[in-house]
Amino acid sequence: MKKKQLHKSNRLVTMLLLVMAILMPYGGAWAQTASQPSEGNGSEGSPYIITKAEELAWFRDAVNNGGYEICAKIADNVEVIDLKDFCHAADASQNLKELSWEPIGNSDWSYVGTFDGNGKTITNLYINATQAYMGLFGIIYKSTIKNLTFENANVTNTENDIGILAGYAGNGNTLQNIKISNTCQIKGGNDFTGGIAGYLDGNAYNCVNYATVQGTEDVGGLVGYFESGKPSKTVPTMAI
């Protein structure tokens, strides 16, 4: 009788270990799952209220799967959205493989909504890419993005159109109250590299960048290439 109970216990332990192995993703960290915000419906009058990185990732996925007009706002009671579990450099000591952020808005579904950072901060944005249009947002058109600070962003791209906020901001965008802190770094490998946006067609109001920007051609502290519009009270930093 005791032997049967021992076998049952061993089988139970084995099953639990198998379940844990399945839940543990390749790379040594627990899987991060995007989750829909519990407040808002994505309209301009009732934007999705973002309270954590999981909800920002869900918003990204919703935009990139056809919801290109939805609007979002970071919650009043949140100070920081930390993306470290959704994008990070490789770390052998933690058995972590590199995970690059997939931008909001792409060549299939360019973002055209309003995103209000509500005076909050996004930290630990990490991008290391070999394709164009890289930033927190990839491609945006006629959108409004405002009231947002970035800290500890690390963005590298070997192609064109790269910025910490947006890679390509074309055709009538409004960027307002955007701050890139000196804890951020950005390095582009081709045309159009900027601290806030690689390419901008639109208006930029009260935008500041304290990070050093490196690139090869059409490099700017604020934007790499400014097509048209009005920059007002903007402070670029050194571009190399």
What function would you assign to each model-found segment?
Residues 2-16:
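Bacterial N-terminal signal peptides that target proteins for export
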Residues 14-26:
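Bacterial N-terminal signal peptides
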Residues 29-240:
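Surface-exposed repetitive/solenoidal architectures
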